[in-house]
């Protein structure tokens, strides 16, 4: 990550500054602890930038730790994708990758310690009964009939759980805290449950697996984490985090701090809902360019720099809010406007024939790769008598506000000649199939000699040299700003979230690299789809338009 990216300020950094100033800590050690049960999304990017960014700015350490305590939902595929996403965003973890499963032996020992202290018991209520006994926000819970078992009985039963003597759902280990607590998380939470499933790291060694709240705090302590940063939904869980560490013989007690999660308009962040979109094939996969996943954004053409800039702009607070899509798009638009080379592509093509241009001949026209960056060089683009232009760039009749090609009037072809539309040819349905023009041979990249003004400029591609391309125009995945609030979020999927066009591009794009962004002049920013980089027909994804369209969406 570039050192030029300014160091942000927020309440968490203020806490760290104070901890260092008072000597509470002499170094900073954070962690990013995803569960490997899905692909990371833009919300995780905020946490990645926060945790790794803090470690980097304070010359500390940040661990990448996989919270792999549920083998049923986890997979090595997700482990690898998460590692790739973190590195792609420009960050590097300290030391080896950590896994909560690395600590399964120690976690088991601490569970036994709680049993010996009379602070944990084996419960044989069913999962439904446990929920019923837990009570509600308005009604206290009630004690399990198994709550007062002796230490010796609990130790024996816990060992029976570990050795496979119970079926799944028939027993669990619970903390013994307070069933009347105003905080439901403290009403004898489950610490261990039974799952007969092979684990991607430990195989079949275990059939009991610790719960997140028990694992998380102990893993932090074992790794020497100084500042454990979580999103606000874990605010009440901090009480359990502290209770566990206060009641086991572990010398280190990290502190948990909460910040607001990232909510983005016109999408969903729930892993369950994202998984449903994938498994029911509403999208192409986890890396579908309409998905809010980091892999989806990357495939769409977002850069790591733009995502880091977005996370910096939205900041870190305790106030939950929903970020407008325009905020994310402005970051990538600014990045690509500055750095993307230009190219020409026609998305909705119509043939244009220049009747007085030498037929069968062609010439090379010089074009800058960036209008404001001569250091990016130039390229040669072929020009001939037959070209493709965009259908929207021609009208038979138009008012003065229309600055493109009109029958009987002139327009300039980008970096080429001034042409005049003379007549059109139509099919049986009245659709224009060919526009016939003449050109001024003395206007190659210069104004007409007689001083007449030609205001409009349109882009083009030589028909004889054109590269056939598939162009995918992506829009928001949902038609309402907050689809997650809908009774059926699938009912508000935007039917026009993907429009596929068959167009033509200048031949230089045959050498385009997968994922590299280009500004298709007058159209928007596009990148070669990495999934189809080796296909016979190249596929370009629209990353973002040239202008903010979200203001209009909201009107």
Swiss-Prot record:
Organism listed in the record: Klebsiella pneumoniae (strain 342)
Motif ('HIGH' region): 34-44
Name this protein carries in UniProt: Glutamine--tRNA ligase
Gene symbol of the encoding locus: glnS
Pfam families documented for this protein: tRNA-synt_1c (PF00749), tRNA-synt_1c_C (PF03950), tRNA-synt_1c_C2 (PF20974)
Taxonomy, superkingdom: Bacteria
GO terms for MF: ATP binding; glutamine-tRNA ligase activity
Motif 'KMSKS' region per UniProt: ranges: 268-272
Binding annotation for ATP: 35-37, 41-47, 231, 261-262, 269-271
Family (UniProt): Belongs to the class-I aminoacyl-tRNA synthetase family.
Reactions mediated catalytically: tRNA(Gln) + L-glutamine + ATP = L-glutaminyl-tRNA(Gln) + AMP + diphosphate
